[in-house]
């Protein structure tokens, strides 16, 4: 049990140490008329490296062939292209207050069927090193389908089941630990009581012998 606890704690520490930036895939099913978040996360390989980043998003509507630019975000300024499909519907939801963008996500409000298609999140990053600078670029591709109502995918169902299984396992483990500790404390208490009783009997016996010796001497 102690080994299991050590493994759990160790995993938590590792997770927290690497938890500064985690690349997560976006959801791909948007509900008509609702607000939908398209995730785009691009982590630096070395967090201590200074960098400046900007992004451009492009979109290819379902049934068409060409990608068109819908926005650019640079120096904390969101520049939207003139496009009726996205007019008044795009909201920046990525990193703020920094030029070193790692979360480049957006919201699309009041989703319509015209928003079904392929999105590309282009990430352009300039890395500053001691003696030189280095440009990198990454493209995150996301395919979005717009549906009438939300459908739970298999991944979310499995995740929920695993969560409940984990809760049950941890509860059983906690109860077992409590029972184990209780038995250990009870055994230690009983041993201490027996030891005290033995000492008391030994002292009583010795006192009687001393008293008998005194009487004989008299």
From Swiss-Prot:
The keyword Membrane applies. Pfam families: V-set. It comes from the Eukaryota. Keywords: Cell membrane, Cell projection, Disulfide bond, Glycoprotein, Immunoglobulin domain, Ion transport, Membrane, Signal, Sodium, Sodium transport, Transmembrane, Transmembrane helix, Transport. It is a single-pass type I membrane protein. Residues 22-150 form the Ig-like C2-type domain. It is found in: Cell membrane; Perikaryon; Cell projection; Cell projection, Axon. Residues 1-18 form the signal peptide. GO terms for cellular component: axon; perikaryon; plasma membrane; voltage-gated sodium channel complex. One of its GO terms (biological process) is sodium ion transport. One of its GO terms (molecular function) is sodium channel regulator activity. The chain crosses the membrane at residues 158-179. Glycans are attached at residues 93, 110, 114, 135. Disulfide bonds join 21-43, 40-121. InterPro entries: Ig-like_dom_sf, Ig-like_fold, Ig_V-set, Na_channel_b1/b3. SUPFAM superfamilies: Immunoglobulin. Belongs to the sodium channel auxiliary subunit SCN1B (TC 8.A.17) family. Regulatory subunit of multiple voltage-gated sodium (Nav) channels directly mediating the depolarization of excitable membranes. Navs, also called VGSCs (voltage-gated sodium channels) or VDSCs (voltage-dependent sodium channels), operate by switching between closed and open conformations depending on the voltage difference across the membrane. In the open conformation they allow Na(+) ions to selectively pass through the pore, along their electrochemical gradient. This is Sodium channel regulatory subunit beta-1. It comes from Canis lupus familiaris (Dog). The lineage of its organism: Eukaryota, Metazoa, Chordata, Craniata, Vertebrata.
């Amino acid at each position: 049990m102690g080994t299991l606890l050590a493994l759990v704690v160790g995993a938590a520490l590792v997770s927290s140490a690497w938890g500064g930036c985690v690349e997560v895939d976006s959801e791909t099913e948007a509900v008509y008329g609702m607000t939908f978040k398209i995730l785009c996360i691009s982590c630096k390989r070395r967090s201590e490296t200074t960098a400046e980043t900007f992004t451009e998003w492009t979109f290819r509507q379902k049934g068409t062939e060409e990608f068109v630019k819908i926005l650019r975000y640079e120096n904390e300024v969101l520049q939207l292209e003139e496009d009726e499909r996205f007019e008044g519907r795009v909201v920046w939801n990525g990193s703020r207050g920094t030029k070193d963008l790692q979360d480049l996500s957006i919201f699309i409000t009041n989703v319509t069927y015209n928003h079904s298609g392929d999105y590309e999140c282009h990430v352009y990053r300039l890395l500053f090193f001691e003696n030189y600078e280095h440009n990198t670029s990454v493209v995150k591709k996301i395919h979005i389908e717009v549906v009438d109502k939300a459908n739970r995918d298999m991944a979310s169902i499995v995740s929920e089941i695993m969560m409940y299984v984990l809760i049950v396992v941890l509860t059983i483990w906690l109860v077992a630990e409590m029972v184990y500790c209780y038995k250990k404390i009870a055994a230690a208490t009983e041993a201490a009581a027996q030891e005290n009783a033995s000492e008391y009997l030994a002292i009583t016996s010795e006192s009687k012998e001393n008293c008998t010796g005194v009487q004989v001497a008299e």
